[in-house]
Amino acid sequence: MSIEAGKTYTMRMGYGEEIVAKITALDSSTYTLSKPVAVVPGQQGIQLMNSLFTADPEAEVTVNISSVAMIAPVREDVGDSYLEATTGIKPVRSKILMG
């Protein structure tokens, strides 16, 4: 799998936290992330929560690739929730009606 800038990914960090973020840039040793959020299990399923409480939420952050244990493209439903949580835009998916 190749990692591409401009796409949203789920990352399991080496210390155990799961992060969802858009990768805006990458090089051989770092990922630059936009609006990273932590995945938190709750009674009604997973929730997305700010992962850096004291940082400017609009600032990009840099993560060392070596601190990422696993990375995968985000699931569509989680990606939709991420988009809504970070921009306020609620994606609309067209449904195919079968009759």
What are these regions (language model features)?
Residues S2-G99:
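Conserved RNA-binding domains used in RNP assembly and mRNA/RNA metabolism
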